[in-house]
């Protein structure tokens, strides 16, 4: 088996050097050799999996930012965030208030109670 492997490697190097084609027999052997090298003994094919690496710098448009100049705006952003939270809470409470509020006196005065 080792002599076949050496022969295939030699044929491939000769093919690359000359720019010509190696023998068809060596091409078939190289294909078989590649299959053997990529398979585990159990018969499972070994494949390289490309994993995505998280890049946490993508949201930063410029890494050379003067961080001291953003301190004035920090208070404004915090204020905007609290305002947004307050508005969303008001929207949520608007729909739940009718369930929690007691009936008004005018409801009794109108005679709507059977």
Curated annotation (Swiss-Prot):
What is the annotated localization of this protein? Cytoplasm
Q: Where is the composition biased (Basic and acidic residues)?
A: 13-38, 63-75
Keyword Zinc present in the record's keywords: the answer is: yes
Q: Name one GO cellular component term.
A: cytoplasm
| Entries under InterPro entries matching the protein | BEX, TF_A-like/BEX
Q: What is its main location?
A: cytoplasm
Member of which family?
Belongs to the BEX family.
Tell me the protein's name.
Answer: Protein BEX6
Give the organism the record lists.
Answer: Mus musculus
Tell me the name of the encoding gene: Bex6
């Amino acid at each position: 088996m080792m002599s076949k492997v050496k022969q295939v490697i030699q044929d491939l190097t000769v093919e690359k050097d000359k720019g010509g084609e190696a023998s068809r027999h060596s091409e078939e052997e190289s294909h078989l050799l590649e299959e053997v090298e990529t398979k585990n003994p159990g018969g499972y094919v070994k494949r390289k999996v490309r994993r995505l690496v998280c890049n946490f710098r993508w949201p930063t448009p410029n890494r050379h930012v003067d961080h001291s100049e953003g301190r004035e705006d920090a208070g404004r952003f915090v204020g905007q965030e609290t305002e947004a939270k307050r508005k969303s809470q008001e929207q949520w409470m608007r729909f739940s208030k009718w369930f929690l509020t007691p009936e008004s006196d005018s409801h009794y005065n109108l005679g709507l109670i059977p």
